A protein has these predicted regions:
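N-terminal pre-domain segments of enzymes
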Residues: 33-72
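Forkhead-associated
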Residues: 68, 73-141
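Mid-length scaffold segments of soluble, non-membrane domains
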Residues: 103-108, 214-257
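Bacterial signal peptide processing site
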Residues: 28-31
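C-terminal motif of bacterial Sec signal peptides marking the signal peptidase cleavage site
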Residues: 24-26
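Bacterial N-terminal signal peptides that target proteins for export
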Residues: 2-17
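Extended, aromatic/histidine-rich regions of cofactor-dependent oxidoreductases associated
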Residues: 183, 251-254, 265-267, 274-276, ...
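Surface-exposed beta-loop interaction hotspot
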Residues: 148-215
Length: 320
């Protein structure tokens, strides 16, 4: 499983602080205790800051991960959905029309949606007028129901043998009250060149997620790298034509970084098998920002006995 969907002002303020005056970085060993200050290349800092700015912009998009307002598991064959108090055994949403419509599942497991009369909705950006079949997020083009003039979005998820509705809204408190991202100082010593060791074609790796689902994910190979004279390995997920994706934990997990681990991406290796792991770009999964995501967890192979004092720190939400 790859991360669902595979990632302003605060970011730019951080960038100004990083680039102002004498540009200093902190180079640290695996323990993070013996730090020696060194001049850091301004071009490197600018690259890292540009990435951080884009990361923040992606999170704060009207349909970004901070916009999630609901994850509703569908346990019955039929559910009315809406925000009204009289929705009964249906799915009560945090935003939207009091009564939006009816979800129904047939014997094959296919879900259909019938909109409530008089409610203005869209399906994939076009006006929704009648009963439709919904494609879940395992489809290359999942169905998207829009409401509140496009500020709200509903999608169908499939996790193992369970189905759920995910609801997003641009007015989500987690988005409007977002507290900003914090990082360890950008450090070029954490941009590490590793060696890609391919697995036999078709190999998969079981990946669990935060809601208890176990899925077999494409596992093309492992990346071996060194830090402070020690060798480490990270199992990669992904398929040719995409980036390598890593779900990892380290000794900062729960001690500075998000307890359930972080994500990291890297370019697919070339013929020489070299892979650059930039741990400055290790980032939090969506579950660090919302209760309504279904994030993959690090496999045992990717739990590093290493203090990775680089990348994104744990997020402290002002929304409870």
């Amino acid at each position: 499983m790859v991360p669902e969907g595979k990632m302003r002002r605060f970011g730019r303020a951080v960038g100004t602080a990083l680039l102002a005056g004498v540009l200093l970085g902190a180079c640290s060993g695996s323990g993070g205790d013996d730090r020696t200050k060194t001049i850091v290349d301004p071009a490197f800092l600018a690259e890292e800051q540009a990435w951080r700015n884009q990361r923040l912009d992606d999170l704060l998009r009207p349909d970004g991960w901070t916009s999630l307002v609901g994850l509703h598991w569908l346990e019955l064959k039929a559910h009315y959905i809406g925000s009204g108090e009289r929705i009964g055994n249906g799915v009560r949403m945090a935003f939207g029309p009091e009564k939006m419509g009816l979800l129904q599942r047939d014997r094959s497991g296919t879900w259909t949606f019938t909109p409530e009369k008089g409610v203005e909705l869209t399906l994939d950006g076009e006006p929704l007028k009648g009963k439709v079949v919904l494609r879940n997020d395992q489809d290359p083009q999942p169905s998207v129901i829009g409401f509140d003039e496009g500020r709200g979005l509903v999608t169908l998820l499939r996790r193992g043998d369970r189905d759920a509705l995910r609801v997003r809204h641009a007015d989500a408190p987690t988005r409007l009250q977002f507290a900003g991202l914090e990082y360890w100082p950008a450090d070029p010593s954490w941009r590490i060149e590793g060696r890609f060791i391919p697995h036999p074609p078709g190999k998969t790796l079981p990946i669990g997620d935060i809601v208890g689902t176990l899925s077999d994910s494409p596992n093309p190979g492992v990346v071996e790298f060194e830090r402070d004279g020690r060798s480490f390995r990270l199992e990669a997920l992904g398929e040719p034509g995409s980036e390598l994706f890593f779900v990892l934990a380290d000794r900062t997990s729960g001690h500075g970084s998000y307890p359930a681990g972080r994500f990291l991406e890297a370019a697919w290796p070339g013929p020489d098998g070299k892979v650059v792991l930039d741990f400055n770009r290790a980032y939090n999964p969506p579950c660090a920002f919302t209760l309504f995501a279904t994030c993959p967890l690090p496999p045992p192979e990717n739990r590093l006995d290493l203090l990775v004092t680089a990348g994104e720190k744990n997020y402290v939400s002002p929304v409870h």
